[in-house]
Amino acid sequence: MVWPPVCATRADGSGRISVDLMPTPHINAADGAFAETVLMPGDPRRATHIAERFLTNAELVTDVRGTLGYTGTYEGTTVSVMASGMGMPSAAIYITELLRAYGVRRIIRVGTAGVYAPDLALRQIVAATGAVTNSNLPAIIGAPDTLAPSPELLATAERVAEATGVALATGTVFTSDIFYEPNDDARHEHTANGVLAVEMETAALYAIAAVEGAEALTLLTMTDHLVTGEHLSSEERQLTVDEMLELGLRTAIAV
């Protein structure tokens, strides 16, 4: 089975759109517009924040559907940033097109998550060493049963965190297709199995990277505590995630 099974119709009547061609259906960047390593926040505004605050000579390279991508340099190394939108279906589109059409080899997701583990604090940064999910996406695309990050990227992030004094926790996250869970059953079940937090994209990233032979890692800042009910405000979120973003960028240039 060839994945993804794209079903839009071309002008030539072939009935398929290849994601090996540029621009792709969802990215209007030119050939060579992306670096080999991409930081991937969910929020397009966070992509802009990364570009404006951390990158030198950052240029907007894609803006289809308001999903923004930039390329610039960080400490002299070329790095790109590309938003994924929310959830696995959206993230899967951008991950696939970046890897297949634009020569991207590494994607580091930099996002936020809700805390499942009672002893995990708000603002804690977590590197996802695995992902479990209620989505069928990994099975549909033929991904391995175990969804894990690139060992090299994970080791690099841990090394950079230690060198820069960043407290980095590691563990499994739950990638959910449902933001508004109808009850706490899933949280209690996953907490019992040692899952640290819940988010909505990592399983897709790890699954597609495995199928495509690419490297991937997720870094998450804990912004909502589903045990205590604590939440960070929008302003607190922005200030808090900068430490994670710098860790992601330093990992990107150190690998």
Which ranges hold each PLM region?
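Metabolite-binding pocket within alpha/beta catalytic cores that recognizes anionic/polar moieties
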Residues: I17-T156
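Flexible, glycine/charged-enriched surface loops at secondary-structure junctions
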Residues: T56-D63, G165-G171, V255
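Active-site rim beta-loop-alpha module in soluble metabolic enzymes
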Residues: L147-N193
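Generic non-transmembrane alpha-helical segments
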Residues: T156-T164, I208, L247-A254
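Zn-dependent metallopeptidase/amidohydrolase metal-coordination segment
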Residues: A203-E236
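His/Asp/Glu-rich mid-to-C-terminal helical/loop segments that flank catalytic regions of hydrolases
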Residues: T228-V255
